[in-house]
Amino acid sequence: MSRVFHIPGVIFLLCAFVLLFLVSISLPYLTALDFARVKFSNGSPTVGSETNPIHQIRFGTWANCWYENDGTRSCSSAHNAYSTTIYDGQRQDFVTVGPSWTRGLAVHPVATGVTFIALLLSLSTHVTFTLLASLISFLAALLTLIAFAIDIALYAWVKHQMGKLDGIASNTDTAPGFWLTLVSFLLLSFAGCTVCFGRRRDRMEGATTYNYSWKDRFRRRRY
């Protein structure tokens, strides 16, 4: 495949794989790579059975982490489809972000695995492998788009639920993991296109070479 398209395609796949790999680790191991982040400006909300007030909570792939007013950080146990319950200061009102909203976050590591396969295939210059790399890149892009849609749904639901807590002022924002997923989707889309265009260019160059070769043989026969 033409190096003009091959090298950028491999770079796009490598960058997408690294970003998705980091997002797949996420909380509780990489606490900066969450999808939705809630900051509380007043009131004394608490999480689960904890009684110490918190000022922030983050939602990641495998767990959530919260920060108490004294700066102490705690995280839930790491597993898929975790649930979070947040109480108001009097522990009379509460909201829950259930497992149905976090179960789909496991699509991120699936997209990471598919991206890794596409990356390995893209390292070959064989026509069959480059075609497979292009197709699998688009598959990884589709899975990443699904993961991003799940991130959007989680963010919207968290924002909706936090607004239902009486006496608690909160601000819900998208977090780094949210945007890294979007960037990964764009990179995978670019990678699939560059690999596909590179293969198309190789076919055109091969056809041109064959055409000139046939004309040369025809001229030699005439003279």
Model-derived segments and spans:
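Interfacial segments of alpha-helical transmembrane regions
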Residues: 9, 129-141
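Intrinsically disordered terminal tails
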Residues: 1-52, 191-223
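Juxtamembrane membrane-interface segments at transmembrane-helix boundaries in membrane proteins
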Residues: 1-2, 89-104, 164-178
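Juxtamembrane helix-break-helix junctions at the cytosolic face
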Residues: 120-132
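Membrane-embedded alpha-helical transmembrane segments of multi-pass integral membrane proteins
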Residues: 15-26, 111-121, 140-150, 184-194
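Juxtamembrane loop segments immediately following a transmembrane helix
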Residues: 142-179
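Hydrophobic alpha-helical transmembrane segments
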Residues: 59-62, 175-189
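A surface-exposed beta-alpha-beta supersecondary segment
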Residues: 20-23, 29-103
